[in-house]
């Protein structure tokens, strides 16, 4: 005789709330991470939209020279940005109630800190929610692991780098041109193009794009025909079908002959693991590189490393990059730095006379 024991359903309001939060039958899964994710991302998104449209100029360098970033103050979609919190605030926690007035809070770039901190909490909770839903559905946890790469990258540029540099004013502005400015200044100050971790990140992103295109084109080119010439090949697939939709043997044979045999995967599972792991590991390394350069452990310096027998410098591309770095450094924050650090550190030659 088989006895079926049913769990007694809680009748309390809290019990029903818990069941609803953790139910996988909802159209959108909420989960306990979602309880924190939803308000933080809504807050970050709302403040970003309002500030991008209407925030007044921000004194980013702390020298009473405000920089305009919003649409209503003369910017467009490309030039507009949420200006980072002022250097006068540094790394201080700067909520609205810490300012003497809302005007002061806006002038010192308070919205940037508010948006960034809520955003980072939100995306971290989104990652946790991915794990939570996978766990409840009996799936493996690799979706959340893959998402940890962009979370690590965002944390590096919005939090770790400002901490290492001593001010949120060094964080990445929230806009298109602001992002480019951040990249240029980062190169000038840290020589990121000569950092091996950044090189691994470039290989991860470009390699991931290449492998994705190769995989998609191979699969699309080796579909098992289920339709006539007058129908789209896509109509030959039915959602949930058990049989394969493409011929992996044909794809393997094609690619093995195109390059060489062992360049082609004969295991679909290891292939898809590779497609996921390659860009994820690359972006992990980039985030780690940003986090180390935050504390001024910079890219390689090969300046003036090649000389002739007379001691004269033979320029290499490293010297060309160094010259570009100096030019970018003297141009950024031009009113905040009377003497850029790299130039001010050069010893003045003695004059005999």
Curated annotation (Swiss-Prot):
Reaction catalyzed: 2 a plastoquinone + 4 hnu + 2 H2O = 2 a plastoquinol + O2
Pfam families: Photo_RC
Repeat keyword on record: no
Enzyme class: oxidoreductase
Propeptide: 345-353
Transmembrane segments: 29-46, 118-133, 142-156, 197-218, 274-288
Family statement drawn from the similarity comment of this UniProt entry: Belongs to the reaction center PufL/M/PsbA/D family.
Amino-acid positions noted as binding chlorophyll a PD1 in the UniProt annotation, renumbered to this chain: 198
Binding, pheophytin a: 126
Gene Ontology molecular functions: chlorophyll binding; electron transporter, transferring electrons within the cyclic electron transport pathway of photosynthesis activity; iron ion binding; oxidoreductase activity, acting on diphenols and related substances as donors, oxygen as acceptor; oxygen evolving activity
Subunit structure: PSII is composed of 1 copy each of membrane proteins PsbA, PsbB, PsbC, PsbD, PsbE, PsbF, PsbH, PsbI, PsbJ, PsbK, PsbL, PsbM, PsbT, PsbX, PsbY, PsbZ, Psb30/Ycf12, at least 3 peripheral proteins of the oxygen-evolving complex and a large number of cofactors. It forms dimeric complexes.
Modified residue annotations for N-acetylthreonine: 2
Residues that coordinate or bind a quinone: 215, 264-265
Site (Cleavage): 344-345
Topology relative to the membrane: Multi-pass membrane protein
Name this protein carries in UniProt: Photosystem II protein D1
Note: 2 of the reaction center chlorophylls (ChlD1 and ChlD2) are entirely coordinated by water.
Species this protein is from: Hordeum vulgare (Barley)
Keywords: Acetylation, Calcium, Chlorophyll, Chloroplast, Chromophore, Electron transport, Herbicide resistance, Iron, Magnesium, Manganese, Membrane, Metal-binding, Oxidoreductase, Phosphoprotein, Photosynthesis, Photosystem II, Plastid, Thylakoid, Transmembrane, Transmembrane helix, Transport
Feature type site, description Stabilizes free radical intermediate: 190
Binding site for Fe cation: 215, 272
InterPro entries cross-referenced by the UniProt entry: D1/D2 (IPR055266), Photo_II_D1/D2_sf (IPR036854), Photo_RC_L/M (IPR000484), Photo_RC_L/M_CS (IPR055265), PSII_D1 (IPR005867)
Any one cellular-component term (Gene Ontology): chloroplast thylakoid membrane
E.C. designation(s): 1.10.3.9
Subcellular location: Plastid, Chloroplast thylakoid membrane
Cofactor: binding details: The D1/D2 heterodimer binds P680, chlorophylls that are the primary electron donor of PSII, and subsequent electron acceptors. It shares a non-heme iron and each subunit binds pheophytin, quinone, additional chlorophylls, carotenoids and lipids. D1 provides most of the ligands for the Mn4-Ca-O5 cluster of the oxygen-evolving complex (OEC). There is also a Cl(-1) ion associated with D1 and D2, which is required for oxygen evolution. The PSII complex binds additional chlorophylls, carotenoids and specific lipids.
